Amino acid sequence: MIPKCRCSAGGLADRTPYEEVVLDTMLYSARLKENVARQNSAVIVAMARLIASTFEDGGKLLLCGNGGSAADAQHLATELTIRYRSSVERPALPAIALNADTTALTAGANDLGYDVVFRRLAEAYGREGDVVLGLSTSGNSRSVFNVLQYARGHGMKTIALTGGDGGIIKDLADLSIVVPHSGSADRVQECHITIGHVIIDLVERLLGYSPSRK
């Protein structure tokens, strides 16, 4: 039986085990984000500068990931192409989530093998001067590794957001951030999406659009 919340007029009299889970989880996530921010603030700014300058030069941002990281890639691409915050008016910015086209993904996986699907799409959409951003909570996604490797060999810049020890992807990217958490993907993904949001905010500022409210 699930324990009921025991409350008093002044608030919680004491916490249930489930409330402790809430507190522990959210505080750990907050501390992890703080640690990542303190260790990587300059790298995050460098990522934003790279993306902003790419847009200014007429290039585009290609993003990719698998599972929850695929959702993050689509999330961030949409906020660049459509809108991040309603307080900033700006043109659409060219960002494509390579994992968004299920027909292309399934055809590529069936005909070529899943590990090369993102690479194949980068062959179609990527051009010299573009940026490829790969997300992998373990850093060991072969499909992300392959597209970053292709991008580097074809005049594109590369960014990686990973977790754990960074895996095989960390040293392949021009700019990378490793979220120091292993054992589960959820906390890493929470950091990745926050990093992505900060990058978008900075890109808008660097391109001269009105600062977003917090």
Swiss-Prot record:
GO terms for biological process: carbohydrate metabolic process; D-glycero-D-manno-heptose 7-phosphate biosynthetic process. GO terms for molecular function: carbohydrate derivative binding; D-sedoheptulose 7-phosphate isomerase activity; zinc ion binding. It is found in: Cytoplasm. Pathway: Carbohydrate biosynthesis; D-glycero-D-manno-heptose 7-phosphate biosynthesis; D-glycero-alpha-D-manno-heptose 7-phosphate and D-glycero-beta-D-manno-heptose 7-phosphate from sedoheptulose 7-phosphate: step 1/1. Binds 1 zinc ion per subunit. It catalyses: 2 D-sedoheptulose 7-phosphate = D-glycero-alpha-D-manno-heptose 7-phosphate + D-glycero-beta-D-manno-heptose 7-phosphate. Residues 51-209 form the SIS domain. GO terms for cellular component: cytoplasm. Pfam families: SIS_2 (PF13580). Catalyzes the isomerization of sedoheptulose 7-phosphate in D-glycero-D-manno-heptose 7-phosphate. This is Phosphoheptose isomerase.
